[in-house]
């Protein structure tokens, strides 16, 4: 494993804050290769921002940049994201 790479669990807290849902079990499909994986299994790279990549083809699925007051998220490489829906 690349020393700079983490799995999707590394961004679980941030994603839960943004989406108000448990995101590591959400299923994403790659727009490039079509592979489907839970968010917890995707590859995460941290630098000036956070880049989420497909573990099969290395396509950029999403990028996250944040500061003290805002968060910017692009989903350029995700074809679909499936979340469990639990109504209260």
Task: Locate predicted features.
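Basic nucleic-acid-binding interfaces
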Residues: 12-14, 70, 87-88
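Short cysteine-rich clusters marking metal-coordination/redox-active sites
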Residues: 30-33, 54-57
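Short linker/helix segments within small regulatory modules
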Residues: 42-51
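A broadly conserved sequence feature marking short terminus-proximal activation segments
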Residues: 1-26
């Amino acid at each position: 494993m690349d020393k700079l790479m983490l799995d999707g669990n590394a961004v679980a807290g941030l994603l839960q804050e943004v989406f108000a849902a448990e995101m590591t079990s959400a299923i994403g499909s790659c727009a490039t290769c079509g592979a489907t994986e839970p968010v917890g299994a995707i590859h995460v790279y941290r630098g000036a921002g956070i880049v989420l990549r497909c573990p099969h083809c290395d396509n950029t699925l999403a990028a996250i940049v944040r500061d003290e007051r805002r968060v910017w998220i692009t989903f350029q490489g995700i074809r679909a994201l499936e979340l469990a829906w639990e109504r209260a």
